[in-house]
Amino acid sequence: MALQRLGYLGFDLKKTFIQKGAEFIFSQQQEDGSWLMPGKNQLVDEEKGYQMMPIQTAIPLLGLVMCGYGEDKRAEQAYKWLISKLLDDGAWPVDIASGNYGGIAGYRRLAHSRWGCRSNTTAVLTCLAYHPKRRISEEAKRALDLILGTDMKLRTNLGFLIARLIGLEKSIGRITYMAKFDIGHILNLCWRVEASVKDSRIAEFVEFIKSEQGPYGLWEYINHPQATRWLTFDLLRSLFKLETQEDWISLELRTPFRSYPKKIKRF
């Protein structure tokens, strides 16, 4: 998280303290490109028994790529490990336990994926979106297409990830690290992946954002108002960038989204 924060603030691999932090993280990397899961005593009940979680590698990789290490051969190895865990439908699973994919809680569902986890998929997509070349890869575009199917407009979550980056929100959780659906972050991903407001889902998110702008031109982060100027800068940048994007094709049909759909009973 420290490298993510420093990278967001504009520090890169030219700084000695960034180099030292990055080398320490790389020193913990496994031969296959991944990073180990925490010890069992650090896992919550929901995570015990898991053998692999994409987010275990996405979190350290994101800090590295935000500081300019995206094309480092060690980072590229981590990307290859993440791509190898990609599901056929373009999402990433929550985990593998005893050779089987883990179940998906409703708050982490993806509308058009059976085993895809929105938190894990968002984490990996964020890593791809900050990479100078992989950000417009088919894997990134497909993942964003799936995430856009989460049709939720939650005002209370708007700005959460920015507030976490600047230290106002706690950095906790593994499976839930990217579980909050923050439209501000989604728009940030959209322009980085070069999506377009011609997609009706993105257009609706943009309209929602504009409707929440305050009387003085600012977007307030409700939980911590001191993050307001940071959130405002981020949203203005995303809105400006999205106005120039046109080359985007969605492959997903638009369907109503429900976190916990009603199950059809047999009897």
Model-derived segments and spans:
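An alpha-helical repeat/solenoid feature that recognizes helix-turn-helix modules
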Residues: 1-20, 36-77, 87-142, 146-204, ...
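Acidic catalytic motifs of isoprenoid enzymes
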Residues: 8-10, 25-28
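Buried hydrophobic core positions in alpha-solenoid tandem helical repeats
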Residues: 21-26, 82, 143, 147, ...
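Short acidic, low-complexity segments enriched in Ser/Thr/Gly/Pro
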Residues: 29-35
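Acidic carboxylate motifs that coordinate Ca2+ or other divalent cations, activating on Asp/Glu
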Residues: 32, 89, 216
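Conserved blade-ending motifs and adjacent loop-strand segments that build the rim/top face
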Residues: 209-226
